[in-house]
């Protein structure tokens, strides 16, 4: 036995909920959502099989019911006007349905949403196109918390609950909290297809403005020659497990973090874009505008794949991700595939423009069959590590980084290899004992500039008479038994002959000395040697103590295996068969501690000893010594020396 109810179009007062449906038919309906509303014909008929308690809803011409056969999915209904297939609604959540609210147009369902909002609805079910049709909307402003649910999902098929932007509309859906007394929180899109009416349509599909806790989950956003999503003043939000495809143009793309509203803090903040699939699109797939100031952006575990060029192709070269501004961002564990200049004019993966600031992390990302740059850093600070590039079908080239930003960087070269596992590039070798200026700290923000011979793309340009950088020695060097050799890699900016000068200060109190940086000779190493008594608390401060600017690339720090010592020695004439001995060179002067001096080198001098025999005589176990000159001839010899140089080898 079954029951039939016929209702005039647009009249839904008798059965807009599960409860009223049960009252109408005097039967229990627990596991299905009852949905009924006037559609595009004069009536809608709703049937409930009393044996299964499953309601079926259909859109058909009036007629007397003759018979039907039903199952949990569909009902084959025979009437005097024909045979029709009706579908069951299997939604188990008791939430309002879009079709509970009637429309004033056969081609635009926007009114239904507006009525739902006015009714205070916070969750709204969107029926699948197989039962209703594509839900058509245009310039729909949602001004309060509203969650739109469907039974579609993230896939390239076009079935299930589908919201389609009307071609002539300037945008599709706008979650718009502008001017609200209470900022909307929550809401979003779940298990839905959101599409343009055709691939050539313009106008963004989704806009979010002045909203918090927005969620887009398990959706498919497709088919528009404009932005898929534009976000402004959107906070604590996420987009996950969603497909983006056939989106964008030369001037648009998939996701735009647009200009902030009012103040820089009214921006896109704490936004998670993760586990999404992106393909077949144009423009910048993720972009921030030059006045967006986004902060705490998480782009993680996404697949970016060029697998075809959509209707609106790129005209100018593009980066997949392009930041006009960015404060803090983490781009991790993503895959990029087949982005080349031949594939829709893609020149690289990440571009950070001059408006970027603070830190972007680019960690553990893979690029397959791409070309161009892995990162172009024109502004801000990039921390990059663990990134791999597989050349794949690209004939040649290795993806690395281009850096012109004046801020310090922390970039590890990309490891590049071919599909057979052959490594083709690991970037420039950096000595493990070398510490780049990028990784040193200080009180002055001396700007960086590009230099083809800099160790990490850019080097610090330091004006005269200012502190350059600082470095704190590790505790292993503060044991009172360590001798350190510190070398600074520097270059004099002046090319007209004025030398530069570099000073090393320890702990802000002790100057080790100043050394000359010779002008017009390129990069050079300035060496300082620290005895245990000079190391102190280990705070190294490098200062440009000269009158011209210098370039500072970084420092080498090594535990010394020797110490170079020199002292005044002017022996004068030495008689035949006689010898002369220098002043005692005490270990307290040379190194300052006991037990470190093991042996001595042969001395050398600043002049000629003219046949004299030279020897080093150890004075005690601690390493004090003399230098002796002996005349083995039958005539006096006068050496032309004033200074002696000797290397003391350490344990």
UniProtKB/Swiss-Prot annotation:
GO terms for biological process: adhesion receptor-mediated virion attachment to host cell; symbiont entry into host cell via disruption of host cell envelope; symbiont entry into host cell via disruption of host cell glycocalyx. It is found in: Virion. Consists in a catalytic region, a carbohydrate binding region and a lectin-like region. The active site consists of catalytic dyads Asp-Glu located at the interface between 2 adjacent subunits. The lectin-like region is probably involved in trimerization. Residues 561-651 are annotated as: Lectin-like. Signal peptide: none annotated. Functions as a receptor binding protein (RBP) and probably mediates the attachment to the host capsular exopolysaccharides. Displays a depolymerase activity that specifically degrades the K21-type polysaccharides of Klebsiella pneumoniae capsule. GO terms for cellular component: virus tail. The keyword Acyltransferase does not apply. It comes from Klebsiella phage K64-1. This is Depolymerase, capsule K21-specific. InterPro entries: Pectin_lyase_fold/virulence. In the C-terminal section; belongs to the K21-specific depolymerase family. Keywords: Degradation of host capsule during virus entry, Degradation of host cell envelope components during virus entry, Host-virus interaction, Viral attachment to host adhesion receptor, Viral attachment to host cell, Viral tail protein, Virion, Virus entry into host cell. Residues 447-560 are annotated as: Carbohydrate binding. It comes from the Viruses. The active site is at 236, 295, 305, 307. The lineage of its organism: Viruses, Duplodnaviria, Heunggongvirae, Uroviricota, Caudoviricetes. Residues 100-428 are annotated as: Catalytic.
